[in-house]
């Protein structure tokens, strides 16, 4: 939030520099993201008085002799401007001066005549008419006649000022205004706060009745409105234009400027309804009807539903509550009567409507952080005072103040000095704490038993208990008073990883050893990601938990699979020119027992693996899984299964000890064709994905791996080339071979062949077998017996022949 230094000085007698105030604000918990000097980039620009003028023959230029006081009484400068006259005072950039935008002015010849600087326009100094009158005139900026030659230009045109760009935390919505920051400045400097004038006098009766009602008090705890007749549109005074300009707003008209000024100064959003456009002279705060439409002041049309709070007349919505007014009720040059609105709207209601409609404003930003119920009272009074001060209209006696029935009371907190100091860990004198709280507009009533009855200001909704009081005390007392000390506990527990964390770290290291890089994605995506994977409607993955207030529609549901996010990461890499890669992610997915949810969903730890590139294949992922199995002392079995997003002929399910862990394989061709990547990438890319239930995997691990001595006897190797049907999987063959004998210690597939000589629907798969016995050498007879049994079992169970 931008706060001008000069505006703060209207509330507090500040006797420190802007830089010193920045440090003090930081010390009491307010981060000044940037302190912006208005004269940034301007140097050696002074007031110059034109004492001689002469047209430069044959050119459009005028030769001027300028009196710049101590910098020289006869500085010769040529200019192309034509709006000045003899005796005028103008901004003069001297030789070697700088202007905003990094422009440096040097003495040079203009049309053959030496010019020792430049006479400036308002725009060249970064000014506009709202900051300094006449700045937007075509030509030079003409300064007041009493300007003194040689004076630095900054104070003359109001550039001797600073803008504090302050980050307001969510717990301090009361500081979303110049007044809110001024309260803090007054407290930290120990100065009195000068409140802005809020007195006004009703001068006439209403000319016709107005009906105001609130049908949704749970979303609008307080609604205030005041009727003003005989509106007189005009220009705002210079001081108001300057306030608005310093905060980044342009002046529109006196009445519009008053609503914007009240927002900035008091932190209270306001709106004014043109009563000539309000049907039935009725204002109704209610939930929108299904399908109702509104066109807002920025000419955007929205279709509404009962989740949206609106301000309506007798026929239609005329404003989105807390966000923006409607184009059908806004003021214009023909406006003669206005109803000024100040209200408190529920922050959740404003935030949800703003997000759902994609409509934001300065008002909605404040309501989303919170506007207290006391604020409308101050805001409306200040606005009415300004209306009377600027003679914008005639204030009537008709005012409305509708509430949800709750009394407007200060919060009372019972505390003791010992409790507050106990939270802080230091001793602060009682009177010092009382003084600090009183400077922050708390009242402290010391009870007979020594306890304090502390009343919080009406605008401090964030203060609820004595630890909050401790925070207020230490903010002003100074965090530097807290002396670092060691904990005096009897024992200290050393930190470390627990079993699950160690297993996860081991998993990541095993995959990293296979050249896989870890990815990290958000826990949200949208149904579009599930659609992309062709997941059917009845699949469990479709039972996704919807976010009530999503950041965007693309992040609207909690993930039930990691694969969609992994595929998005792969696509992003391909778009950015990364033609190959290996990735993994270990993260929870969120599974609901039923929808809508009525209990906390199960967060299942899941492992997802992805590999992409022209050289990647099925065995890249399978090899990574085998490395995991070996690392944890497990044996994986593979069965022919697939998933909606995988190629039905190049995929498999992973099992361990009879438990299904997950599925992996090549991305289905039809999904690959739909990816938003270049056609040549689709044709050359191989994308493989795998997703495992990590919790099921860890349940198969039986404690820590222990050292097992290598057999002193060398294993016997045998290769088998087998002919089988296309439907037979590698996993089925491996399982049959291993079950034939305990002597089989290793089975590896090393070749697959298809050819006409094998016959239609046939393929050849070659396996390398290792046979070993830790106690003795395996004899040739034993090898022959095991091989015969393997071939017999393969033929009987799977119809496989030796090639």
Regions found by a protein language model. Give the residues of each.
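A carboxyl-terminal module marker
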Residues: 2, 20, 439-442, 462, ...
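Extended, well-folded interaction surfaces typified by the phenylalanyl-tRNA synthetase beta subunit core
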Residues: 180, 413-579, 718, 770-774, ...
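Class II aminoacyl-tRNA synthetase-like tRNA-binding/catalytic domains
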Residues: 108, 284-324, 328-331, 488-603, ...
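Mobile "lid/hinge" segments at catalytic clefts and subdomain interfaces of large enzymes
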Residues: 114-130, 135-140, 154, 162, ...
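Glycine/proline-enriched, intrinsically flexible loops and inter-domain linkers
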Residues: 5, 23, 53-55, 189, ...
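Conserved mixed alpha/beta core segments that line enzyme active sites in large multi-domain catalysts
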Residues: 33, 47-78, 246, 259-328
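Terminal amphipathic helices with adjacent charged low-complexity linkers/tails
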Residues: 185, 189-214, 391-420
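Phosphate-backbone binding interfaces of nucleic-acid-interacting proteins
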Residues: 1-202, 206, 339, 358, ...
